[in-house]
Amino acid sequence: MDPEEIKQKKLQEMQAKAQDPEYQRQMQEQQMQYEMQKQKVLRQILSEEARSRLARIKLAKPEFARQVESQLIQLAQAGRLPVPLTDEYFKGLLDKIYEMNKSTKREVTITRR
């Protein structure tokens, strides 16, 4: 078998697996378990005010909120966060994360003549 045939066969297997209802159910279940575990960790490390602030951010900027959640979990697992995280400390972290994102994004401006 040449590499192209192997790629085609694997692609067909993956497509068949993705259409399998049992596989889809398992994937949804794994996703739900991951979300529940993430929420459990966030409840442990965030104060009530910080959790409500994160919920408001999630409504306004879901992608930014996901990034903040993952960074909070990583910092907590590394033991680099005070537990529970106060709202003031959380605001400082949000500012730092926002500044990091702002500096890495490039803006393109198009000027018309």
Swiss-Prot record:
Is DNA-binding found in the keyword set? yes
Feature: compositional bias, Basic and acidic residues: 1-12
- Name the SUPFAM superfamilies on file: Double-stranded DNA-binding domain
Instruction: Recite the lineage of the species.
Output: Archaea, Methanobacteriati, Methanobacteriota, Methanomada group, Methanococci
- What keywords is this UniProt entry annotated with? DNA-binding
Q: Does the keyword DNA-binding apply?
A: yes
Family indicated by similarity: Belongs to the PDCD5 family.
Which GO CC annotations does the UniProt entry carry?
cytosol
Region listing for Disordered, in residue ranges: 1-22
Q: Which GO terms describe its molecular function?
A: DNA binding
Could you identify this protein by its name? Answer: DNA-binding protein Mevan_1162
Organism this protein belongs to: Methanococcus vannielii (strain ATCC 35089 / DSM 1224 / JCM 13029 / OCM 148 / SB)
Q: Name one Pfam family in it.
A: dsDNA_bind
